[in-house]
Curated annotation (Swiss-Prot):
Homology family: Belongs to the bacterial glucokinase family.
UniProt cross-references to NCBIfam families, sorted A to Z: PRK12408.1
PANTHER family: GLUCOKINASE
Binding residues for ATP: A18, D19, V20, G21, G22, T23
CDD domains xref list: ASKHA_NBD_GLK
Pfam families in the cross-refs: Glucokinase
Protein name: Glucokinase-like protein XF_1460
GO CC annotation, single: cytosol
GO terms, biological process: glycolytic process
GO molecular function: ATP binding; D-glucose binding; glucokinase activity
InterPro entries xrefs: ATPase_NBD, Bacterial_glucokinase, Glucokinase
Keywords recorded for this protein, A-Z: ATP-binding, Kinase, Nucleotide-binding, Transferase
């Protein structure tokens, strides 16, 4: 829960907040704002490539340097946190354990929070981050807000209003089964089931998912893949040099529209949808050309209700750090 926004923030020393993704880690020293309503102050933001470091401890040790006064750290990361504090995730290049980090870095406290749970705590900071309004009214109704974004995996969380003290519900929506609507999508899912018993949503809606969809399309058309990375597929689609690359992004956006619509109905997210993550800002043009909105609204009689739900694309940027910091400050205040 979030404390009264007009109340003075607790007197908390500076701490470190990190947003840990499958590709990058963003880290900052954070100073608490004077009131709970004010955004935390990010004093020194740095970005690290995961592939360049053998562990998160190495990254944080490099960042901390001579900052011996910093004793606490909060980490936003994808995955499911077990009761012993370790994180179950398929998207990080190394294990993540707060006990190990605390020992390695000689810190007093290391806290973990789901990455999209942290992002949900930054909802009040998102207006300035809006890149694109995709559908729905400019002003949303009061109600739960859905945050969702494909990156190395697919993150999702729900922000629920609660008389000025909102509740954030983290989810593992990316691990739910990938639904199919069209005949082509059914063929793609059937092909993906050839070597697995479960096709999760993030097997299509993620950076690696773009490559999975592309390879499946190539297999269905008996064509050898010409590209070996999501970036190469996106560049070929943007250049108009490869029909299958363009079709891959079309399928990706269609899946996204359907799944966002499904989640809005499941969670009653009448307060709107924020699309984040590291991929979608790079796919603005394919998203605008796609059937995203049509698929989002294609829910039978419920399509009319979905017309009143705004869907916005935001630039994730430093919001993961801000959200992690807000989560930590809220934890200290309650």
């Amino acid at each position: 829960m979030i404390p009264n926004p007009t109340r003075d923030a607790p007197n908390i020393p500076s701490f470190v907040a990190a947003d840990v993704g499958g590709t990058h880690v963003r880290v900052s020293v954070v100073a608490a704002a004077p009131t709970c309503a004010s955004p935390p102050q990010l004093l020194d933001v740095r970005t690290y490539r995961c592939a360049d470091y053998p562990s998160l401890s190495t990254i944080l040790n490099d960042f901390l340097g001579t900052r011996s006064a910093v004793r606490d750290c909060v980490i936003a990361s994808a995955g499911f946190q077990r009761s012993d504090g370790t994180v179950i995730t398929t998207n990080l290049p190394w294990p993540l354990s707060p006990h190990r980090l605390r020992a390695d870095l000689d810190l007093a406290e290391v806290s973990l929070v789901n990455d999209f749970e942290a992002l949900a705590y930054a909802t009040e900071d998102m207006e300035a981050a809006q890149l694109l309004h995709l559908t729905g009214p400019a002003k949303a109704q009061d109600g739960p807000r859905l945050l969702l974004g494909p990156g190395t995996g697919l993150g999702a969380a729900l922000w629920i209003p609660n008389n000025g003290r909102p509740i954030v519900l983290p989810t593992e929506a990316g691990q739910a089964a990938l639904p199919s609507t069209t005949e082509l999508e059914m063929q793609l899912v059937r092909h993906m089931l050839n070597n697995r018993t479960h096709v999760p949503i993030e097997h299509a809606l993620s950076g690696p998912g773009i490559l999975n969809v592309y390879r499946a399309l190539c297999a269905l058309q008996s064509v050898l893949p010409q590209h070996a990375s999501p970036d190469a597929i996106s560049h070929a689609a943007a250049a108009g040099t490869d029909m299958l690359s363009s079709q891959t992004l079309e399928v990706f956006c269609d899946f996204l529209g359907s799944i966002v619509g499904d989640l809005v109905m499941m969670y009653g997210a009448q307060g709107g949808v924020y699309l984040a993550g590291g991929i979608l800002p790079q796919l603005r043009e394919p998203l605008l050309r796609s059937h995203f909105v049509e698929r989002f609204l294609n829910k039978g009689p419920m399509g009319e209700a979905l017309q009143h739900v705004p869907v916005r694309l935001i630039e994730h940027g430093q919001l993961g750090i801000v959200g992690a910091a807000r989560w930590y400050l809220n934890k200290k205040a309650t």
